[in-house]
Amino acid sequence: MPANNQRANLIKMHGSIDWFLCDKGYVWRVRENDLYPKADRRVLIYPQATKYVATQQDPFSTQFDLFRKSLNSSNSNMLAVCGYSFGDDHINNEIEFALSKAENKTVLLAFLECRDEIPPCLEKWRSDSFGSRVIIASIHGLYIGKEGPFKRKEKDDYWWTLKGVTSVLKNGCEV
């Protein structure tokens, strides 16, 4: 644990391509140079109609519980989201429930390419009472609550990528 008691939780809500179920029922992660077991032992939630039911079973229920506890902490939190399209109501409901609590200090930072439009739930949240705590870094620019998009003066505007965010954190951003 860092000296300042800050921590980061990396929560893979739908599993990972490097998670496998061993014969004893434990989930383990394949590391570099490990031999990959059979693909049918992979622990993933695939995009299908039974996705919600699968999230109610371990190891996913444990991940979801950690997600819920992290969101509902009374401490200042940053929920940084990448690789998620905001298409799962059960996840969106948890985020919205946490953000809507008056005592909640969580800030949502969503990294989205979204070439067409911002997902409907994010559009709704931007206009809500907690909208100032909803930040969207997208191909169209940076949105902070109802404001935006703000674009950087640079020709190559790539906020929504790890490289772009790292650049902004390191060099600041001129809009």
Place the predicted regions along the sequence by residue.
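Active-site-proximal segments of catalytic enzyme domains
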Residues: 51, 59-64
